[in-house]
Amino acid sequence: MPNYIFWPYESLFENSAAQGPQVALAISFEKTHFVVLGVCEPQYLEEVSIRPPYSVVATKNNGAEGWNYKVADPCNVHFRIPKLKFMQFYSSDPISLIIPEKEVGLHSSVGETLNYSKLEQHPRYKRDNKKLSETLNIINLFPAYCKALNELYPFIQTSQENLRGTMLNSVAAWCSSTCIYKMVAKIGFYLTFVICSIASLVSSLLNYSHFQLVNYSAFVQQIDLRCQQICYFPVQYERINKKDNIQNVGSMVEKDNSNSQFSHSYMPSKFYPDYILLYNTIWLIINDISFGLILGAILIENRDFLVSASHRVLKFFLYDSLKTITETLANNPLGIKLNAELANFLSELFLWVIEFSYTTFIKRLIDPKTLSSLLTLTIYMMFLVGFSFAVSLAIDFFAILSFPIYVFYRISSKLYHCQLNIMASLFNLFCGKKRNVLRNRIDHNYFQLDQLLLGTLLFIILVFLTPTVMAFYMSYTVLRMLTITIEIFSEAVIALINHFPLFALLLRLKDPKRLPGGISIELKTTVSNKHTTLELQNNPIKFKSMFRPYNLLLSQMRTNYFSFATVRKIVRGESIMVNRNKLYYVLYSSLPSKPLSVKDLYKRLTIQA
């Protein structure tokens, strides 16, 4: 089995012009490969003993082009040093833009996750992949290990530009020690705690166990989302600003020079997803308010036209069209002969509901003065808190106005569903069968003649009444699906505003190394080389992985509302509901499942301060 030696390009280029003999010094632990940290001249090592985990892996004679390796069957792997300052790092697995506790819930199948976990624990997979992962951890902390080596052996040339003290760092350290800075930090601490406490209290009230308002209102859910984001900001900031990770590497190497398990817990890249999620959320909030300012200005200029047009459209859709459809259903629509008595009864019932709802609240809500006041409120809301709040308020307003359609759909679907169940039971009776509820099966049964006659008469009556009930049911089902489509489309717009991976896309275009999607190792051996040479490269994350929550959201929408299962529900008369909480759960992937309490929040802020 070859011994892999990871060489940084910077070290190769810095020492390629040197003519004298050289010695390459590397670090390696029990579960890692060799990683070259620097080179020096041999005379510096004559009076110094190199202690583990450091060792000499190669030497170079005076004027020689190649290296003489001290290990058997060496294999060189060249890599470029990741810049910790710019949050570049290597990762064998694609970086996750989702909180780990939400990963299992977003998988299409929990069984797939369990199978992958079992495969990951296989000895062969664990042996090969673990060694490479631990080596990548050393590479990611390469400047820190170089600093630790340079402090122990100052004569060794290492590449540690990222850790050299600068004047800016000195000025920042001096400013942080002044009284003014401490006073401002104290004020910021208490101000942050008060804001987060209010947000946490509001979120707790909206998610009260006995009556969760977030399940019934899009506007309330938007408030809850923003409150949870505000509460989670300090936690994300505290995670991404830990500076003890790099500084303690040298002491940890001295304490435990045979094991590298500590390196994973000291990896700064562990919290890079929080960095991306934090600034992505901040950018989206700023863009949300920007869109609100732009669209609010447009709405102000066209307010009179929008009010009059909205009044006409809403009156036609919620009153005139409903009344026309209901009256048409009572008069044999499309030449289909319906049961006159049942059609007139249902038509008069629905017409009474239409008139009652219109005179009670719809007429007042769609009045031009009311619409003008509501539009003004929406515009001010756009200016203050963003476009998403205005859209969510419009969704709730539309849901209130379309409540009569929901009532008609529920009544007709219940009638249709009950009629189908009764007809199925009577058909079993006609065939001499009976449903066994305990065993959930159809058994043969003997019925009396009068039972068969009565069942047959009822079955025939229901068969002749089915076209009438179906006509009302299908008409209001179409209207209900139209309202659901409008609500879902508006919810998708809100989801796009709140959770679009804008910051991640910009990072992907600007610096793909900050969003690793795995690694690739390519062969670089030339004819003059005696040993195999490989090149370690960072593969950027795929765009498909960045939009994975949206793919799951679209899949849920298609499955629940626009699939064969939806058609089957309509045929059976089952209710089609908008489960906003289940639909929107996918897009809460950047937030913890349980909102932070005030006590936990205070602990986080205290640690950060």
Curated annotation (Swiss-Prot):
Pfam family, one: Gpi1
PANTHER family, per database record: PHOSPHATIDYLINOSITOL N-ACETYLGLUCOSAMINYLTRANSFERASE SUBUNIT Q (PTHR21329:SF3), PHOSPHATIDYLINOSITOL N-ACETYLGLUCOSAMINYLTRANSFERASE SUBUNIT Q-RELATED (PTHR21329)
Subcellular location field: Membrane
Entry annotated with the keyword Cell membrane: no
Catalytic activity: a 1,2-diacyl-sn-glycero-3-phospho-(1D-myo-inositol) + UDP-N-acetyl-alpha-D-glucosamine = a 6-(N-acetyl-alpha-D-glucosaminyl)-1-(1,2-diacyl-sn-glycero-3-phospho)-1D-myo-inositol + UDP + H(+)
Extracellular domain ranges by topology: 1-186, 302-380, 473-485
Organism ancestry: Eukaryota, Fungi, Dikarya, Ascomycota, Saccharomycotina
Assigned keywords, A-Z: Glycosyltransferase, GPI-anchor biosynthesis, Membrane, Transferase, Transmembrane, Transmembrane helix
EC top class named in words: transferase
Name of the protein in question: Phosphatidylinositol N-acetylglucosaminyltransferase subunit GPI1
UniProt membrane topology term: Multi-pass membrane protein
Membrane-spanning ranges: 187-207, 281-301, 381-401, 452-472, 486-506
An example molecular function term from Gene Ontology annotations: phosphatidylinositol N-acetylglucosaminyltransferase activity
Main location: membrane
GO biological process: fungal-type cell wall organization; GPI anchor biosynthetic process
Any one annotated GO CC term: glycosylphosphatidylinositol-N-acetylglucosaminyltransferase (GPI-GnT) complex
Subunit structure: Component of the phosphatidylinositol N-acetylglucosaminyltransferase (GPI-GlcNAc transferase) complex composed of at least GPI1, GPI2, GPI3, GPI15, GPI19 and ERI1.
Gene name tied to this protein: GPI1
Residues on Cytoplasmic side: 208-280, 402-451, 507-609
Enzyme Commission identifier(s): 2.4.1.198
Keyword Transmembrane part of the UniProt annotation: yes
Pathway: Glycolipid biosynthesis; glycosylphosphatidylinositol-anchor biosynthesis
